């Protein structure tokens, strides 16, 4: 009961710490997150539809890039029973709830390593409050933050499982076959808890963080295996190691499978995205046909020279848009120059001068954490160090990216799935766990007097000399950091650059002094604690209990770590970043141009918004079905289309607009925007406060074509768009032989008719055949058509093979939608869609009148839901059974002890 009270108190402390960092959430305010604003923009169409049609939710949106699956946007999937637990853990005001989850996970991880509770609290604070977490919260990378928050939970499950399996009450060489009751129940429980934690971590939906987590897990498992192999007296535990490994693998797979409702659709979608690579062969040497372009993936590589940021937050200036006081050199200069809005200007200065394009801030791990980590490298021996060192080194090498290209290319070309990821500097999040874990593990052992006094002093002064000595050196000679000049300074006058450089040097010196003081305080506390006489510090249960000065030291370290990370974190997430929900919705207030466009009653057309960053802005998608948008997982064929045609056509449009006097004059000259018109780009926004440019040449929702041009390769297929009249002729790739055969047969009939009559048959433009869009929903399109013969229709809709289905219904009829699936009438016929004009949908329509129904119903969703449901039910039952097994084993053990004492 006493322990329950202690843990409840620690939980309450974590709640206080989380909410004290973001007290604004208690007033109902939210973080003004740019990425969340973008998410609401890209998700608005799907969310609106799903709210109005809960029985027929959409997995497709036309709001950006012509249309794409919502797999990476909407996470409202059915089937997973563990999702309720996941959402319960997120109870509370965000982002405080994210910090609370990270604190609890860090605490559990430290306990799994055998640390005392007070040191575990310090380690939890060090893990949860790293400055990078605050930066990603501020910009809105919520899924990344959730994935990082569950990182220590998963690792704690792994460590607990192996420790339970290998903590036997028998000596080496004894028969261990009959002692399974002492370790197997807890091992199964540990593996089950690991599976739950892994399930939650994957639910956060950030595969790159999960990938880094897998590296750490493998490092730990391999480290334990090597330890058992090289120690003869421990080899008898290899059996338990393999059993624990098998349990983690099997039960962990079940945990992963609870997310099948999300993973399977994502697995199906990824090969078609930018992360699946381009089919084109004419790209640069850095192109990876099975993943992202190498230059694109490594654009954000952490500089080798900026690694001291881990110890000194402003070593490279901090953030790309940072704040300086008015009495700084830059402030004085701008004040003398009469800079308007000086106070506002001083809040957004280019202070970062490192090699990355720009950054929200440094990967500051905490001066105290770095000192303790270095101390651990020197003092700690054996298995608890080397797996952490290995994981940390791999993470650092990966984060260096383009600055350590041979290693990066090795992983990019040969490591499974690694080529799907970008922003490689993110790998340093591994250090947010490994560094505190080793550092505070060693501090715990120091306070438990596990080290020789002389060895501790020697190691302590070496670690102090390395860390505090470097800080002192930066204070006295800041020039060792570099020139304090950034490549982004090139457009500024020399006098401003000189002022900025002076201020950057000042920032470095101040933070170097700050880190020096913090390290000195902790080292002094350690020396003070170690000077005390050895006392009896063993509890009733045989565990070590901190007493006397050690308690004071541990508590002081908790406070110092909190102060260190709290104060730096506030630089990147503070009250200025919080706004009311009402103010947040102002992002989506319709502009004048939006209101004009909304007057169009056509249910399906596209808008090209040039008043924003067209292909890096998703807020435009809140109001319109856009040709642009923002998504790191857009369809690769669409990205190819942007690069080959849409971007050049936009450039051509600007050229026309520059020479025009009126909007009407611009509209007259839009005939060259072939691909934009093919995508039914009906409106072009230039000025948000004026009427849009109307593209009268847009092809519309659908049209008939009479002929085709075959393309043998993807390169030929995309190139033919330039030379083909897409209104009358379709470009068809060789991967659609049935469509090519239809066109070939139709062309033969045309030639035969020409030979028999001596004149051409009636063209499409003069034909009475018609096709009209009659109903629009993001996941369903209905068309009414009438033809005198079989005809090929092309639709200004994006082709995607994994889910779009089509039926021909008799004229005036429609089946029913049941459980999100279309049930056709008995007279309906399902037909195949084909890809035309690089990425549009095409269909062969029968002779006569009828209704064409297109619906997005990917089979992967139903399969995923079934697997998720079965896996989550099994996992919940296994948790109950394993917990009951541990309780029964503990009860039997107590009865056995009572019997032996009688």
What are these regions (language model features)?
Residues 14-103, 109, 125-137, 141-149, ...:
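Membrane-interface coil-to-helix junctions
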Residues 241-302:
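Polar, glycine-rich mid-to-C-terminal structural blocks
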Residues 6-44, 250-264, 394-397, 471-472, ...:
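Transmembrane signal-anchor helices characteristic of membrane glycosylation enzymes that use polyprenol
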Residues 44, 50, 54-76, 80, ...:
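Extracytoplasmic/lumenal acceptor-recognition loop(s) of multi-pass membrane glycoenzymes
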Residues 371, 397, 670, 682, ...:
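Active-site-proximal, structured, solvent-exposed surfaces of multi-pass membrane proteins
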Residues 97-114, 369-372, 438, 523-524:
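Transmembrane-helix motifs of polytopic, lipid-linked glycan transferases
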Residues 139-150, 161-165, 187-199, 207-252, ...:
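Contiguous transmembrane helix-bundle modules in multi-pass membrane proteins
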Residues 110-129, 178-189:
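Transmembrane-helix signature of polytopic, membrane-embedded enzymes
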